[in-house]
Amino acid sequence: MHKLAHTSFGIVGMFVNTCIVAKYVIINWEMFSMKKVNNDTVFGILQLETLLGDINSIFSEIESEYKMSREEILILLTLWQKGSMTLKEMDRFVEVKPYKRTRTYNNLVELEWIYKERPVDDERTVIIHFNEKLQQEKVELLNFISDAIASRATAMQNSLNAIIAV
C-alpha cells in the first residue's frame, strides 16, 4: 500500500509538475505572442509614417518637375474627374488654406492649366475650368504621376499591408 501510495503520488506529482511546466510554457508563449503582436502592431502603425513619406515624395517629385503644389495637383485631378465647378464646390474636394487660396488658383491660371469664369448673374461666384488646349500636357502629367507611383509601388504596398494587419 505504501508503495502504491508512493507510485500514485509519483504519478500525481508528475501530473502536477507537467501542469506547472505547461502553465509556465503557456504563460511564456502568451507573453511572447503578446510581445510579437505588440511589435507587429507598433511596426504596422509606424508604417503610416513610411507610407506618408512615400506619398509626400511623389508630390515633391511632381512639384519639382511641374512647379505645382500638392493642392494645385489635386485641383487639376478633381477637375479632370468631376468637371468644371465653382471654387466653393472645389473646397469640398481639396482643402486649400485660406491664405493660399487666391495664389493657388492664380498659379494654375498663370500656368494655363485652368481658366476662371464669372457668371453674368452672380459676380461673386467663380467657376474654374480645365484648359482643354492642354490635353497633351494632361496626359504627360498623368503618366509622370503614374511612373512616380509605380516606382514606389512595392514599398507602399508593403507598408499598407503592415498597416492593415494592425
Curated annotation (Swiss-Prot):
A GO MF term: DNA-binding transcription factor activity
Key words of the record: Activator, DNA-binding, Repressor, Transcription, Transcription regulation, Virulence
NCBIfam families according to UniProt: Staph_reg_Sar
Similarity comment: Belongs to the rot family.
Other remarks on this protein: Virulence accessory gene regulator (Agr) and Rot have opposing effects on the expression of selected target genes and agr also controls negatively rot activity by an unknown mechanism.
Listed Pfam families: Staph_reg_Sar_Rot
PANTHER family xrefs: HTH-TYPE TRANSCRIPTIONAL REGULATOR MHQR, TRANSCRIPTIONAL REGULATOR, MARR FAMILY
Record feature DNA-binding region, as residue ranges: 87-110
UniProt entry tagged with the keyword Transcription: yes
This protein's name: HTH-type transcriptional regulator rot
Protein role: Global regulator with both positive and negative effects that mediates modulation of several genes involved in virulence. Negatively regulates the transcription of several known virulence factors such as lipase (geh), hemolysins (hla and hlb) and proteases (splA through splF, sspB and sspC). Positively regulates the expression of sarS and other genes including those encoding cell surface adhesins (clfB, sdrC and spa). Also, modulates the expression of genes not previously implicated in pathogenesis.
Keyword RNA-binding: no
GO biological process: regulation of DNA-templated transcription; response to stress
Gene designation per UniProt: rot
Source domain of life: Bacteria
